[in-house]
């Protein structure tokens, strides 16, 4: 079966393995940066005089920053799993994309334009609102000088989700049968952050409920 033939992306075994590998790498990097911090402090305390402290402060600070950053990856990674459990993969070709500000939004971030699943003629900008792990994607979005083979690495675009709320994008792994570089995208109105009201995008009740199960914050159903 093709990846797009499964009822949800999570039913596709290579996708499950890709997500597990994604989580393992986060854990490995977290342990690694903690080990760097502990090891550096141990060397400073056990083998060096206090005069070397200023030399180690930047390293300890950077190791702390990187360890905290790995912790910050866990929550969006669990949301990735929730999205994959709700939506099937789609293979999208020639998806409109840009590195500069989209004319329909306020934020100056990279974006894809994805069709509204209930109104395919409507293109919805889906932004890279979280700046974590975006450099790989930014290089492949490219510019007029970017090599075509680099841009081709995100053709087709693996897409699972609803662009009105929350989605996962990925690139093709080796052989094209498994995803790699799983990345969470979402609308700011779907985050549930204080002061940001959710919006329903005129979505059907079924679409709203599906998005809610995928981890998006959506309005409560209107009373009948």
Mark where each language-model region is.
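Short, charged cytosolic
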Residues: 1-12
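Acidic, low-complexity intrinsically disordered regions
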Residues: 6, 15, 29, 33, ...
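Alpha-helical transmembrane spans
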Residues: 10-81
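Intrinsic disorder/low-complexity segments enriched in polar/charged and small flexible residues
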Residues: 12, 35, 91, 113, ...
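Short secondary-structure capping micro-motifs at structural edges
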Residues: 78-83, 142-146
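Short, glycine/small-residue-enriched coil/turn segments at secondary-structure junctions
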Residues: 84-88
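Acidic, Ser/Thr-rich low-complexity segments on the non-lumenal side of membrane proteins
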Residues: 89-134
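A membrane-cytosol interface segment of integral membrane proteins
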Residues: 126-216, 220-223
